Amino acid sequence: MRNFITFSLFVLLSQNLYAQRFNTPLNLPNYDKKPIHFGFLIGINSLDFKITTVSNLEDEVFVIQSQNQKGFNLGIVSNIRLENQFDLRIIPTLSLAERKIFYVLNDDINLNNENKKIESTFIEIPISLKYKSDRYNNGRAYILTGIKYSLDLASQRNIDDNGLEIVKIKKDDFLFEIGLGIDFYLPYFKFSPELKTNFGFKNLVVNDGSIYSRSIKSLKTRGFTISFTFE
């Protein structure tokens, strides 16, 4: 995250210095006066779980840890201008994600390591309030915050696992999001690199009686996304 912020600020500063020195023309001068505009988003996500184990963890369970994995996002941007420095953004997104839960189990003879993989296909609807700085030449910084509804189309909550002992999680979630980015005004469109982090509100664990689920008291989503919007 620190590298992303440093790089973005460096690019913005370099752009402004170049513009001041060479008198670069202002791109899209009336862009921010539009009441609404559209675009698309591509990005990568990194998700894992915040895990809280039960207080009386069974003797056969030594360790439970979450391992973050990378995924892909594709979305459609709808941006509504509220006033000069505030926008409302709605970005329906298809998100392909994967998470792993690592267990160390004791069978009275050996310690066994097990990875339980959870693959998800999310339909996400984030609604964010975007606050923009003043525009400097062809760039401006912004921060945003909001909530996101997430529906997992690949949820295995209600399926019969046929003895495979998969970790089942609930199908939907609500998350809090906060992020930052920079708008770059190019000759024909606006390009914006953006970093967001999110935290789930719901406990997603489904206790089906297996050792993998009954050892977990709470399972909440957390992660971050690096995305690029073209508007």
Predicted features and spans:
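Short glycine/proline- and aromatic-enriched beta-strand/turn motifs that initiate or cap beta-hairpins
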Residues: 20-70, 231
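Outer-membrane beta-barrel strand-turn architecture
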Residues: 32, 80-84, 133-137, 184-186, ...
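Residues that define the transmembrane beta-barrel architecture of outer-membrane proteins
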Residues: 34-36, 68-72, 119-123, 139, ...
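Transmembrane beta-strands of outer-membrane beta-barrel proteins
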Residues: 36-42, 88-92, 123-125, 141-147, ...
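Transmembrane beta-strands of outer-membrane beta-barrel pores
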Residues: 44-48, 94-98, 133, 147-153, ...
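Repeated loop/turn-to-beta-strand initiation elements of outer-membrane beta-barrel proteins
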Residues: 48, 85-88, 137, 188-191
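Flexible, solvent-exposed loop segments that connect beta-strands
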Residues: 52-66, 98-120, 153-169, 205-217
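Predominantly the C-terminal beta-signal and adjacent terminal strand-loop region
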Residues: 171-173, 181-231
